Amino acid sequence: MMTYLSKQFSKLLFGQLLFLFIGNLLLKPVQAYPIYAQQAYANPREVTGRIVCANCHLAQKAIELEVPNSVLPNQEFEATVKIDYDLNQKQLLGNGQKGGLNVGAVLILPEGFRLSPNSRSPFFNTYSEQLPNVIVIGPVPGEKYREIHFPLKAPDPTTNKQVHFVKYSIYAGGNRGRGQLYPNGQKSNNAPVLASVNGVIEQIRENEVVIKTDQGDLVSQAIPAGHTLLVKQGQKIQNEQPLTMDPNVGGFGQAEKEIVLQNPTRLKTFIAFCVTVFIGQLAFVLKKKQVERVQASEMN
């Protein structure tokens, strides 16, 4: 009896360990799906002003960035990145099937500006420990996040000497859909297949095209699932000529806006000055009216 129970316990323990091991393997790709730029670039903005996401998302699609014109120290405010696209469009997924578009965004803030500590969204992350002023999000479902609202907090120059009461620039980048390249230069299946040689289409199979070169050699090129062929058997083709239609329906865009970190003392002084000028003008008008009445009474 004890032997039987021991065997059953061993089977149960082995099953649980196997489940955990397989589950861990399956979960790793999900957990290891960060913004690819974080893995390949120390800074998301190049010296030319180009945001590095454009190196993998080759198509260009505009985005909009909305921020307040000015903020006060320690003020919490919101920046909105609008990533618009046709919801009826479907993108080519990694498995060759069609699915909805995902979106992602990066917001590059001035030094000292941070993600609001009151933000409860699990999707926002800082780009790195060295760049806490750069906020990233994605990939997230495009149907829900065509507008991404970043909750932010302005710095206080009285406590942070690296910050000043001046005008700053805020940069944003946003993409919809999958990229065409990986950071290592490898193409994804979300890009057209180009001919690697000159020649003639010798044969078309289910997942490959065989090209007969001008020298008589046969070159086979794989065609990912979900692609639509543009060529037919017997057709003469050139090197780098598209063999399939471009499956990409997404694209990347970037925008820039300016924001002023206002000095409260200067703002109060300006308001006091405006009030003083208004009172002075009002007193002048009243005095003028009084003089006119006196002159009118003397004439009568």
UniProtKB/Swiss-Prot annotation:
Transmembrane segments: 267-287
Top-rank lineage group of the source organism: Eukaryota
Taxonomic lineage from the root: Eukaryota, Rhodophyta, Bangiophyceae, Cyanidiales, Cyanidiaceae
Cofactor binding, note field: Binds 1 heme group covalently.
Descriptive protein name: Cytochrome f
GO molecular function: electron transfer activity; heme binding; iron ion binding; mRNA binding
Organism name: Cyanidioschyzon merolae (strain NIES-3377 / 10D)
Family of the protein in this entry: Belongs to the cytochrome f family.
Cellular component annotations (GO), alphabetically ordered: chloroplast thylakoid membrane
Swiss-Prot/TrEMBL cofactor(s): heme
InterPro entries: Cyt-f_TM, Cyt_f, Cyt_f_lg_dom, Cyt_f_lg_dom_sf, Rudment_hybrid_motif
Pfam family, one: Apocytochr_F_N
Residue positions binding heme: Y33, C53, C56, H57
Cross-referenced Gene3D superfamilies: 2.40.50.100, Cytochrome f large domain, Single helix bin
Keyword vocabulary terms for this entry: Chloroplast, Electron transport, Heme, Iron, Membrane, Metal-binding, Photosynthesis, Plastid, Signal, Thylakoid, Transmembrane, Transmembrane helix, Transport
